Amino acid sequence: MSYQDPQHPVSAPPPQGYPPKEGYPPAGYPPPAGYPPPQYPQAGYPPAGYPPPQQGYGQGYPAQGYPPPQYPQGHPPQYPYQGPPPPHYGQAPPKNKKDKKDSGGFMEGCLAMLCCCVLLEACF
């Protein structure tokens, strides 16, 4: 299959504007008709009586209500408040995150960035 239109040379621009009335639609298309086509149902879709009204429950549903009677109903039983659990005396207290010396993170980061820039400048 070729991507070029065989009716027009490559050096000439394609024709502009809408196609002429007699040339539209192209051959192979059915003649224009009203919408919707006659084989489709008209106003009143879906046809009256379709689907038929259901009587009671559809098939596959139990006749009794939900949930089935063998399950308990209502909230679970509530117990009196017992308070928090006792502390664990055998454990060590949590460690403080400031155990190591504060190293001045901002200044250390700036110095590292400056060293990297100097090293890259020297290499390139």
From Swiss-Prot:
Mostly expressed in stems and,at low levels, in stems, roots, flowers, siliques and leaves. GO terms for cellular component: cytoplasm; nucleus; plasma membrane. The chain crosses the membrane at residues 101-118. It is found in: Cell membrane; Cytoplasm. This is Protein CYSTEINE-RICH TRANSMEMBRANE MODULE 10. The keyword Calcium does not apply. It comes from the Eukaryota. Signal peptide: none annotated. Belongs to the CYSTM1 family. Residues 27-40, 65-88 have a biased composition (Pro residues). InterPro entries: CYSTM_dom. The keyword Cell division does not apply. It comes from Arabidopsis thaliana (Mouse-ear cress). Its main location: membrane. It is a single-pass membrane protein. Pfam families: CYSTM (PF12734). Keywords: Cell membrane, Cytoplasm, Membrane, Transmembrane, Transmembrane helix.
